[in-house]
Amino acid sequence: MGHYVLNHEYKGLVEIGVVVVIAFAFLHWGINFSLKRWGQKWDVRGITDVAVLPLAVIVFSLFFLVMTPVTNTITRTMEFEADMYGLNAAQQPDGEANVDLMLGEYRKLDPGPVEEFIFFDHPSGRTRITAAMRWKAGHPESASADEVARPVFAKQ
């Protein structure tokens, strides 16, 4: 729900759209550079020659490989904003921390900063738990997970 309320679908389209426009500019530059340098050797006559397609795939792939940390950061930032929205809506930081610990069974909880920057498209468990505990420290009136769960699971 946080993604919807925070308009992440539109922000994401714009931000990734900018990356794609830059990708096509890089593709144009990369193909022209390669054709000037190796076009005769490869017997590729120009950018309109169908033989340029493998080169286009390679240039595009290299661009997005290098841009992976940027695209992951775009996604990770929106995920963190949605997490904060969820904490403000539910006001259950202990529940958030418990869920993040459960997610740690199949996902690394405490990556290094470089590892998180390059490979993680969502905040790490450590980042999410730390944010939940900071939120809890700033909102002492919030309910703990036990207080919320007791009425639901109490025997009658």
Where do the PLM segments sit?
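A Zn2+-metalloprotease active-site environment signal
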Residues: 2-88
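Short, strongly hydrophobic alpha-helical membrane anchors
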Residues: 1-4, 154-156
